[in-house]
């Protein structure tokens, strides 16, 4: 009986630990608290549609640019986020996407398209196949792709 009790206790402990890990890994709700300090909503300029079309073409993915809620932190080169300093930040939670761009980069095709690619792939991380090989949307691969 002691062995059975010990096994049940170990199982309960493992399940509780798994639940805590899952909660820690699950993104929180997208909303004002998930945005960098100073973020304000903005309407994407018409140029973003051209960049979206290019990003769809290079990635072979499709999506709806209009479904993204856009934010910027005006007057900054880097935004302070809970995951470090960023020039762009893609978040998806509860079926809603937000993209926040540092104010100095709202007109930067590389930065904006990089965040668009996250949306088209619906994922964090930077799979080399898409971000480097297909689309050239990293600082190092951008110059090669754009011919600069």
Question: What do these predicted ranges mean?
Answer:
Residues 22-24:
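C-terminal motif of bacterial Sec signal peptides marking the signal peptidase cleavage site
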Residues 105-110, 122-148:
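Post-HEXXH active-site segment of zinc metalloproteases
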Residues 113, 117-121:
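Short active-site segment of divalent metal-dependent hydrolases/proteases
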Residues 28-106, 148:
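Auxiliary, metal-adjacent structural segments of Zn-dependent hydrolase domains
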Residues 19, 51-52, 129:
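Processing junctions and N-termini across compartments
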Residues 2-15:
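Bacterial N-terminal signal peptides that target proteins for export
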